[in-house]
Amino acid sequence: MAVRELCFPRQRQVLFLFLFWGVSLAGSGFGRYSVTEETEKGSFVVNLAKDLGLAEGELAARGTRVVSDDNKQYLLLDSHTGNLLTNEKLDREKLCGPKEPCMLYFQILMDDPFQIYRAELRVRDINDHAPVFQDKETVLKISENTAEGTAFRLERAQDPDGGLNGIQNYTISPNSFFHINISGGDEGMIYPELVLDKALDREEQGELSLTLTALDGGSPSRSGTSTVRIVVLDVNDNAPQFAQALYETQAPENSPIGFLIVKVWAEDVDSGVNAEVSYSFFDASENIRTTFQINPFSGEIFLRELLDYELVNSYKINIQAMDGGGLSARCRVLVEVLDTNDNPPELIVSSFSNSVAENSPETPLAVFKINDRDSGENGKMVCYIQENLPFLLKPSVENFYILITEGALDREIRAEYNITITVTDLGTPRLKTEHNITVLVSDVNDNAPAFTQTSYTLFVRENNSPALHIGSVSATDRDSGTNAQVTYSLLPPQDPHLPLASLVSINADNGHLFALRSLDYEALQAFEFRVGATDRGSPALSREALVRVLVLDANDNSPFVLYPLQNGSAPCTELVPRAAEPGYLVTKVVAVDGDSGQNAWLSYQLLKATEPGLFGVWAHNGEVRTARLLSERDAAKHRLVVLVKDNGEPPRSATATLHLLLVDGFSQPYLPLPEAAPAQAQAEADLLTVYLVVALASVSSLFLLSVLLFVAVRLCRRSRAASVGRCSVPEGPFPGHLVDVRGAETLSQSYQYEVCLTGGPGTSEFKFLKPVISDIQAQGPGRKGEENSTFRNSFGFNIQ
């Protein structure tokens, strides 16, 4: 059966017309091999590696396989040795029948690169069949007046073997009336003819029995016999005559059993028994006798067995008509079997790989062959796959197709494809065959890990415990398997002074970040670093993200009082004039807090006072002011305890103790800088010496009285100075800009210092006093000098 295949592109369809055996995809030659039939399974045919000129082991490395046209595995390839072996006993007669030579066509498929080699195997015949006559006895009715030399064709014997192993000669048993003549027939066949050598005489011998022997040409020769019985008849001078020498008819292959194929008819002009014609098959094969039957009286030929166009597409039937007198005639009936679309297309997969790397464009996945046993339009096929798939069907040779990837695949978009290969014929009705294959896309490392965020901000409260989990980073990889396994690491910091290795660590498997030591907000408020995420593919891909760590302040620092100093030294007394108005600024408590935010928000509160209600502390700036007018009944000395508290949780606090002294006639003295006071005191001492000399000269007349009076006055004034607390206010202005500090936690106005002296060798300390106000600045130098002189003289000593 000749199969033509038509394929043309339509969407994903591939249609191709095979008009002849094409050229191999690899441009290879045509291999011809042979083997004797009936050889045992596993018999050696050829070494393909040597025959194809391939290196040892190349057949196995390239996945070489053998594919037969009818998908039957007659041959087996040992890819390691390269030997091509028979996979079963080959019977030439079953494979090819009488056809000679008997050829089996197959293909050799190899990958990397893909190649197809066409080859054929000839099955050589052996003489394993003896000739066989279909009829064990043949009856010939011969009239006694038959002329000498008349030939009577006999039915030939059947021998499945071919060539020299087929029938080569016929013989007849010895007799005095007949001999055998060999005549040629169609398709190179020989037929025996029985030739009359001597006239018959019915009255002398009415019947003869001869043995016909058929001999083949094998070695040793095989033979078969049949009996020829000759009946001598009276004279019958007219033989039957067929209306046609050749009857041609057609029968669809799906015709039912009993279907009338054709009716033959022969006429005999004799009369009586000599005119009675009977019909029979003549020299018919076993296949014809089992497929058809003939009515011996009417000449009607009926279908005895279903037809199959794909097995036999035509029959040649020899019909013999014989009259009652033994005369016969022959005709031939040619039956053409009409093909119907009763065979769906066949799809035979020769090789298939269910996995393909995602970065492998135009990679062969499957090699398959399509076939339709029908003919004509019924045998034309359309082959296609679904639309919108990244695959192509590429036609090869001899009905072969290759399924390849159209381009690079992306496993992250789609990891599995279910492909349906559909083969449809063009018959009516159309028949189709579907073959489903599943292709898995294997992963390659083409995606770097991706962090869930480009930057991370982590918060950790100071004074944390070491190894505290402070946060995590996370990265995902769209690949799979080891290509998606992510390892985290710390990258070298951009700031070379940042001791990152001693601050944080990262879990390489899950990205958890840990603080290695306790953090101190006051030392390090924030820092940043980069983390890397690397997969385990080859080559490895990585990506990095920025991590910012903000240290949150904890209330771990208590307020610290800057003024007045609380260092355990002798307390410094603040002077408050009794004439001060309500709200008069006595002093200011200055404190700071090492924390930040609300932990450093300070508030002030008067905790204890000698006389409650006399003084008040402003909560937000620590200023100590008078709450009411002072009176003579108020005590001269006062002790205040001020509580300084931050706004943390829990709050921390500190206390400051203030000593206040209420004085009369004290306005707003200026205090010089502590370091300037000794020089000015020295100048005043020198001036006092001059005054003393002048005084002594002026009162020389009153020497004794003056001395006594002077000593008495000095002693009196020293006693008064001791009762004031031995505090002296140096003369001279104090530069306000040196202590003008802005801010909620420090001084907001200009203050002066006060030097406090003890009764010892002269150790002193300084502290802030009341602000310098404008009425003091309005006083002239003379007034200041007078007041300072008065102040010095009233206390009775100079500051050194």
From Swiss-Prot:
Matches recorded under InterPro entries: Cadherin-like_dom (IPR002126), Cadherin-like_sf (IPR015919), Cadherin_C (IPR032455), Cadherin_CS (IPR020894), Cadherin_N (IPR013164), Protocadherin/Cadherin-CA (IPR050174)
Residues annotated as signal peptide: 1-26
Subcellular location: Cell membrane
A molecular function GO annotation: calcium ion binding
The Cadherin domain, residue ranges: 35-133, 138-242, 247-347, 352-451, 456-561, 568-671
Gene this chain is encoded by: PCDHB10
One Gene Ontology cellular component annotation held by this UniProt entry: plasma membrane
SMART domains in alphabetical order: CA (SM00112)
Function: Potential calcium-dependent cell-adhesion protein. May be involved in the establishment and maintenance of specific neuronal connections in the brain.
Membrane topology label: Single-pass type I membrane protein
Sugar-modified residues: 169, 181, 418, 436, 567
Record's keyword annotation contains Calcium: yes
Gene3D superfamilies: Cadherins (2.60.40.60)
Pfam families referenced in this protein's UniProt entry, alphabetically: Cadherin, Cadherin_2, Cadherin_C_2
Cytoplasmic face residues: 714-800
Natural source organism: Homo sapiens (Human)
PANTHER family: CADHERIN-87A (PTHR24028), PROTOCADHERIN BETA-10 (PTHR24028:SF54)
One record GO biological process: chemical synaptic transmission
Keyword presence, Transport: no
Name of protein: Protocadherin beta-10
Keywords: Calcium, Cell adhesion, Cell membrane, Glycoprotein, Membrane, Repeat, Signal, Transmembrane, Transmembrane helix
